[in-house]
Amino acid sequence: MTDLGEATTIDGPVSDAPPDVVLLDRRIEPAELRRLAERFEDMVKYVVDVERRLVAIGGEMHVDGEQLLLDAGSRQADLWGANYHPGRGREACIEYTSFINIRPSAGNRSMELTDPALRERIRAITFALVGEGEPL
């Protein structure tokens, strides 16, 4: 797994985020992940700041997490959306698909993130802060 270095610490509330979107700078508790995953039964949407190593997880749309991270000082260019599927194991738990990933100016012309290096960074941050596909 890629070395994550020092994670950014967030002190106090960042914005008026919906209660079903959580900003992570450390590993999420399994009970909290279970609560967030209830919306879609077996999946939770999340957005990763690949530079600050933060995750905004939960919500109905990726844009909810994107906005929370922007409010916390993230840069748009560093934010990428994905879906986490608990119980699918390490190789199948991350789906690198989101409307916020459509960025022709960054070389990504579809909802699916295609850059292998970015995918690996997201994978490492996901495994550190969210999980590795373990069942809830």
Where are these regions (language model features)?
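Short, charged, low-complexity amphipathic alpha-helix
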Residues: 2-39
